[in-house]
Swiss-Prot record:
Binds 1 Mo-molybdopterin (Mo-MPT) cofactor per subunit. The keyword Magnesium does not apply. This is Putative xanthine dehydrogenase molybdenum-binding subunit XdhA. Pathway: Purine metabolism; hypoxanthine degradation; urate from hypoxanthine: step 1/2; Purine metabolism; hypoxanthine degradation; urate from hypoxanthine: step 2/2. One of its GO terms (biological process) is hypoxanthine catabolic process. The lineage of its organism: Bacteria, Pseudomonadati, Pseudomonadota, Gammaproteobacteria, Enterobacterales. It catalyses: xanthine + NAD(+) + H2O = urate + NADH + H(+); hypoxanthine + NAD(+) + H2O = xanthine + NADH + H(+). It comes from Escherichia coli (strain K12). Belongs to the xanthine dehydrogenase family. Its EC number is 1.17.1.4. It comes from the Bacteria. Presumed to be a dehydrogenase, but possibly an oxidase. Participates in limited purine salvage (requires aspartate) but does not support aerobic growth on purines as the sole carbon source (purine catabolism). Deletion results in increased adenine sensitivity, suggesting that this protein contributes to the conversion of adenine to guanine nucleotides during purine salvage.
Length: 752
């Protein structure tokens, strides 16, 4: 059972919005109804006269300090730092919902009403919604310096020549949508001051230590003057890997004498003013020989980062790097540009660029297989990464690669050949199809980012162990896995290990946070090191108590035993702990601490199999069966792993078939910023989600494991697209596959 399960299901778990303090005030934004322009004048007299309003701040009142919001580890290399293009408030609004002012009042309703009473005169500017328009010669600059945020190129050599020399070439133009994370818990921050020099922030964040640094930068105060507390978090999926409302909450309390101020966003504001998934436009080419050997492929990517950089070009660049592991024995070229537009800012979201890139690669490879008459599973088996291969861009060796085994296992469980045979030569309105797609991903951000984790273990008087880790539990089950790691390494029952889930930057060891599927992989070395050190101290103390050599003793199930007679307990850990605490001379509280930097980053692999039915007349896709198979190394907790995979599959189905932020191409206004009009799949829309694992030990890992948090979403959309193509003969390269899009594509193909 998860270590946090009881607290959550009973309601005892405290989330940020559960924190209420005496004298707490509430802040609400005044936001732009236009996507691009200037606030010419502002009239807040009516709002200020409302009883209960404490203050109103505009762009003229906030520090003139641009800051970056992306949740990346800090770097000493100035050229690698995130783009600092944000201000707390702005006169130059760059997207629908940009913030120009903020109202602080004694209660939330008064703050909302006062914000609505603020009137602004606007000067509108041309609106740009696509990267193509942003790069036009006559495009209005959204930021000083132009609309091209950054571009990069990666290549293994003369890739075009290799593609042209292959027996068969395939090209494709692919488009993916802007979507929102839709985590259950909204974005909320609460800040106050307990003395004149320090600000305390409670926030729903994936990155407490990074929040501390960014707040310091945004307000130009020492980082040590900021304390960030992360309580329970109701999901993030990358949205909370940005520093969102914490700088504003800190600014407000500093201006209002240190009183507690809460900034809480509505669901509509989460759509408009937090982060989205980058929309990609991808032009791809691929060269394949008649026997199915992939000779080379190239991708040209345009990434839409919206109004502010946030994670910016990192998304497009990372997507190209992560997919390089998938089919590493071929030529590969990847070029990408990231552009500013007048859309809500895009940032990190589960998969970090990989779902978009894999959609293009796996669609092209499937089209090549169809044209060459090759089984889609066989063409992937022929080219799949194997142990001993290397990333063609970086030369990093692959020490564990279970992709072939994933395909073989999935093919057997899914009954691929039988189902595929049943889908041949179909006529009529209802048509079945099967599809498959693969992925590769990484286990952290190294070497692009510094990967560091810290852990502190302290023994209590009853022999139980408290664990403090900088790694952030945001609902993914990290604390449960950490307790297992410590329990196994020290030699105690899992029930005797308590992970302190609330991070506090004043107390908790340093760790950048929860992102990049890094938590268990990067935290494991620090936890293991601290656990081994604590075990060594325990045995050393036991040796003194028992007049034995430490070499003769070990710790099993919370008891000191002789190595040669492990079945005979000599002493309980509780008895040892009491002696260590209270003996008049020897011992002391037994504790251990470790901080370790990780310099390895193994790839994880996997695939999705899907069986679906297309109702051509209704333009509707129904998934009959879907299976994900993953190589994530040694599976530390099968139940948690299954939950991770099911969650990712559900999100992948949403991205493939349902979800899209509808943004007016002319005005930049978001038309569906709510959960009624933004169509997420609900339980009746989802089939039974199946998962399986291929456990291959990763030798670079502390416990033989690799990433699993993000990968399950990555191949789902491509597999669904490929199954729809098999069912109908129509290759649809734009997501999502909504009834409207299916109607348009089927009409063009002459099916309706």
């Amino acid at each position: 059972m998860r270590v946090d399960a009881i607290a959550k299901v009973t309601g005892r778990a405290r989330y940020t919005d559960d924190y209420v303090m005496a004298g707490m005030c509430y802040a609400k934004y005044v936001r732009s109804p236009i996507a691009h322009g200037y606030a010419v004048s502002i009239n807040d007299e009516q709002a200020r006269s409302l009883p209960g309003v404490l203050a109103i701040f505009t762009w003229e009142d906030v520090p003139d300090i641009p800051f970056a919001t992306a949740g990346h580890a800090w770097t000493l290399d100035e050229n690698k730092r995130d783009t600092a293009d944000r201000a707390l408030l702005t006169r130059h609004v760059r997207h629908h919902g940009d913030a120009v002012a903020i109202v602080v009042a004694r209660d939330e309703l008064t703050a909302e009403k006062a914000a609505q009473l603020v009137s602004i005169e606007w000067q509108e500017l041309p609106v740009i919604t696509t990267p193509e328009a942003a790069l036009a010669e006559d495009a209005a600059p959204i930021h000083n310096g132009g609309n091209l945020l950054k571009q990069s190129t990666m290549s293994t050599g003369n890739v075009q020549q290799t593609i042209d020399a292959a027996d068969y070439q395939v090209q494709g133009h692919y488009q993916t949508p802007v979507i929102q994370h839709c985590h259950m818990e909204s974005v909320t921050s609460l800040a106050w001051m307990e003395d004149d020099s320090r600000i305390t922030i409670v926030s729903s964040t994936q990155i407490p230590h990074i929040v501390r640094r960014v707040v310091g930068q945004a307000l130009d105060i020492p980082w040590s003057c900021v304390r960030v507390i992360k309580p329970f978090v109701g999901g993030g999926f990358g949205n909370k890997q940005d520093v969102l409302e914490e700088p504003m909450a800190a600014f407000l309390t500093s201006k209002l004498g240190g009183i507690p101020v809460k900034v809480s966003l509505s669901r509509e504001e989460c759509f408009l003013a937090t982060r989205t998934r980058h929309a990609f436009t991808i032009d791809g080419q691929m060269g394949v020989n008649r026997d199915g050997t992939l000779k080379g492929y190239s991708l040209d990517v345009l990434s839409n980062t919206g109004a502010y950089a946030s994670h910016g070009h990192s998304i497009a660049s990372a997507g190209g790097n992560k997919v390089a592991y998938l089919y590493p024995r071929c030529a590969y070229a990847y070029s990408s540009k990231t552009c500013y537009t007048n859309l809500p800012s895009a940032g990190a979201m589960r998969g970090y660029g990989a779902p978009q890139v894999v959609f293009a690669v796996e669609s092209m490879l499937d089209d090549a297989a169809t044209a060459l008459g090759i089984d889609p599973v066989e063409i992937r088996l022929r080219n799949a990464a194997r142990e001993g291969d290397a990333n063609p861009l970086t030369g990093k060796r692959i020490y564990s690669a279970g992709l072939p085994e994933c395909l073989e296992k999935g093919r057997k469980i899914f009954e691929w050949e039988k189902r595929r045979a049943e889908c041949q030569n179909q006529q009529g309105n209802l048509r079945r199809g099967v599809g498959v797609a693969c992925f590769s991903y990484t286990s952290n951000t190294w070497p692009v980012g510094v990967e560091i984790a810290g852990a502190r273990l302290l023994m209590n008087q009853d022999g139980t162990i408290n664990v403090q880790s900088g790694a952030t539990e945001i609902g993914q089950g990290a604390d449960t896995v950490f307790s297992q790691m410590v329990a196994e390494t020290v030699g105690v029952p899992v029930s005797d290990v308590r992970v302190i889930s609330t991070q506090d930057t004043d107390v908790t060891p340093f760790d950048p946070g929860a992102f990049a599927s890094r938590q268990s992989y990067v935290a494991a070395p620090a936890l293991r090191s601290a656990a081994l050190l604590l075990k060594e101290k325990i045995i050393a103390h036991a040796a003194v108590m028992l007049h034995q050599s430490a070499m003769n003793l070990t710790l099993i199930k919370g008891h000191i035993v002789l190595v040669e007679r492990p079945e005979e307990p000599l002493m309980s850990l509780k008895d040892l702990a009491m002696d260590a605490f209270y003996h008049p001379e020897r011992g002391g509280q037994l504790s251990a601490e470790s901080s370790i930097k990780t310099t390895t980053n193994p790839p994880a692999f996997g695939c999705t199999f899907v069986d679906l039915t297309v109702d051509i007349a209704l333009c509707k896709v129904t998934i009959n069966r879907i299976l994900n198979v993953h190589d994530s190394g040694h599976i530390l907790n099968p139940l948690l792993a299954e939950g991770q995979v099911h969650g990712g599959m559900g999100m992948g189905i949403g991205w493939a078939l349902f979800e899209e932020m509808i943004i007016d191409a002319k005005s930049g206004v978001v038309r569906n910023p709510n959960l009624l009009d933004y169509k997420m799949p609900t339980m009746p829309d989802l089939p039974q989600l199946e998962s399986a694992f291929v456990e291959i030990n990763e030798p670079q890992s502390a416990y033989g494991h690799k990433s699993l948090g993000e990968p399950p979403i990555i191949p789902v959309a491509a597999a669904i697209r490929n199954a729809v193509k098999m069912a109908t003969g129509v290759a649809i390269n734009t997501l999502p596959l909504t009834p409207k899009r299916l109607y348009e594509e089927f009409h063009l193909a002459g099916l309706i």
